[in-house]
Swiss-Prot record:
EC number(s) from the headed UniProt entry: 5.4.99.25
Keyword Phosphoprotein: no
SUPFAM superfamilies, sorted: Pseudouridine synthase
Classification via NCBIfam families: TruB (TIGR00431)
Name of the protein: tRNA pseudouridine synthase B
Role: Responsible for synthesis of pseudouridine from uracil-55 in the psi GC loop of transfer RNAs.
GO biological process, alphabetically ordered: mRNA pseudouridine synthesis; tRNA pseudouridine synthesis
Residues at the catalytic site: D44 (nucleophile)
Gene3D superfamilies: Pseudouridine synthase (3.30.2350.10)
InterPro entries recorded: PsdUridine_synth_cat_dom_sf, PsdUridine_synth_N, tRNA_psdUridine_synth_TruB
Top-level taxon of origin: Bacteria
Alphabetic keyword roster: Isomerase, tRNA processing
Organism expressing this protein natively: Nitratidesulfovibrio vulgaris (strain DSM 19637 / Miyazaki F) (Desulfovibrio vulgaris)
Keyword Isomerase tagged: yes
Length: 308
């Protein structure tokens, strides 16, 4: 029996297979001695692709990772069929002819996704109403309220079109429902549509070329440490602030650190700047933010990256 690795602290970029839920994938990795584990951005069971698994201290950066994160998806939709989940996993609720739709219609509608838009949240989703996930209300046969959210689509293009199917690629903000894009396209074209395939190709700042297959990770637990990426690479746009050993000890006890421009490559002070504090040996110590305290510019700790 292979020796399980110690608790890791960093990110594992996983290529989630089609079938299991994100939670099931996390549970399998957890069996490799990883008691403290989470992820940034759920994928539906039918979807595959980049799933960012957070290990140890990296679980504390989840909110920042998801807030900063642009995502790229490759999806395929099929015209003429509508389901209750808006994808191929659900039960068919309606069918309609689609022979009036042309490839140019598809391209036009996909281009219309661009920009900031309000999209309807799928009735089968983890979004909550009065504390209950919508999917639980839907499965119980209860009426689900129509919820909308604002999303940003920065790129959208048709990759191929072989009606009734069309494959597209979108670059979007975190939290975008690709099922909703397919569903709304079908509604606008008057024939309905469902999502049949979905691959997340990129979840900022990692692409699928850096992702590890789940089966390989599980089969070789001894290689987990070499597959884990440091926290500093997860937030590439955050400056690195190296502090002294004395400051590190103080930070762990709630002390603030003076803002010194020379420590930040002469970056001028502004409130709300964020950085990753590093110990003298480059170990991540904390996520920090600039503030004015007692009329002085300082760094304060957003989240400590040490064991509590």
């Amino acid at each position: 029996m292979a020796v399980l690795p110690a608790q890791q602290h960093g990110l594992l970029v996983l290529n989630k297979p089609q079938g299991p839920t994100s939670a099931q994938c996390i549970a399998r990795v957890k069996r490799l001695g990883q008691k403290k584990i989470g992820h940034a951005g759920t994928l539906d069971p039918m979807a595959r692709g980049v799933l960012l698994v957070l290990l140890g201290h990296a679980t504390k950066i989840s909110g920042h990772l998801m807030a900063d994160g642009e995502k790229v998806y490759l999806g395929t939709l099929r015209l003429g069929t509508t389901t209750d989940t808006w994808d191929a996993e659900g039960s068919v609720t309606a069918t309609a002819p689609y022979d009036h739709v042309t490839p140019d219609d598809i391209r036009r509608e996909v281009e219309n996704w661009l920009g900031s838009t309000e999209q309807e949240v799928p009735p089968y989703s983890a979004a909550k109403h009065q504390g209950q996930p919508l999917y639980k209300l839907s499965r119980a046969g209860r009426e689900t309220p129509v919820k909308t959210k604002t999303v940003e689509i920065s790129r959208a293009q048709v990759v191929s079109c072989d009606l009734p199917s069309a494959t597209f690629r979108v670059t979007c903000s975190s939290g975008t429902y690709i099922r909703s894009l397919a569903h709304s396209l079908g509604m606008r074209l008057g024939c309905g549509a469902m999502l049949t395939e979905l691959t997340r190709e990129y979840s900022h700042p990692f692409g699928i070329d850096e992702a590890h297959e789940l089966d390989a990770v599980l089969a070789e637990p001894e290689r987990l440490p070499e597959r884990v990426i440091p926290v500093t690479r997860a937030l590439p746009h955050w400056p690195k602030l190296r502090i002294s050993a004395a400051q590190e000890a103080g930070v762990r006890n709630g002390m603030i650190v003076p803002y010194l421009p020379e420590a930040m490559a002469e970056l001028p002070f502004a409130e709300g700047l964020k950085a990753i504090m590093l110990a003298p040996d480059d170990t991540p110590v904390a996520l920090a933010e600039t503030r004015i305290v007692n009329a002085q510019p300082v760094w304060t700790v957003l989240r400590g990256l040490w064991s509590q």
